[in-house]
Amino acid sequence: MSVTLHTNLGDIKIELFCESVPRTAENFLALCASGQYDGTLFHRNIRGFMIQGGDPTGTGKGGQSIWGRPFSDEIRQTLRFNNRGMVAMANAGPDTNKSQFFITYAKQPSLDGKYSIFGKVIDGMETLDSMEKTPVNPKSRPLQEIKLLNVTVHANPIADQAKGGLA
């Protein structure tokens, strides 16, 4: 199961961990498939740490889950921030996941157990490199827009299962 984030700097393909974190994957996939992420900005960019997006307001304060309220963390000991390109839900504390997500630029072991990891970058590291090199203001907001144009969902087992198809 994978998606491709089409950005103005290039594409990033992400493998999703649907079996390990089904609720988080369902939320992300549904937001992708419904176009909720289309045209949104990556509003926070910290070199050596991560880039954050998924807020339709572009402020870092907006966004909502598909259930209309925050949902619980899915922390798994087998999923760790042990590589560049790990993808996780951004939150404001335990069990406050909505629509915002981030992609790491490096190993971040201090984040383990605090954020629901739901995927990893499997193609497009050069795009991630370009994002990381984008200059930012003192509040870590990119000086040049980094925009998520749209998302391609390559296979959606959750939707297929709901339609009675093969999972």
Swiss-Prot record:
GO terms for biological process: protein folding. Pfam families: Pro_isomerase. Its EC number is 5.2.1.8. Keywords: Isomerase, Rotamase. Signal peptide: none annotated. It catalyses: [protein]-peptidylproline (omega=180) = [protein]-peptidylproline (omega=0). The keyword Isomerase applies. CDD domains: Cyclophilin_PPIL3_like (cd01928). GO terms for molecular function: peptidyl-prolyl cis-trans isomerase activity. PROSITE patterns: CSA_PPIASE_1, CSA_PPIASE_2. One of its GO terms (cellular component) is catalytic step 2 spliceosome. Residues 1-153 form the PPIase cyclophilin-type domain. PPIases accelerate the folding of proteins. It catalyzes the cis-trans isomerization of proline imidic peptide bonds in oligopeptides. Belongs to the cyclophilin-type PPIase family. PPIL3 subfamily. This is Peptidyl-prolyl cis-trans isomerase-like 3. It comes from Cryptococcus neoformans var. neoformans serotype D (strain JEC21 / ATCC MYA-565) (Filobasidiella neoformans). The gene is CYP10.
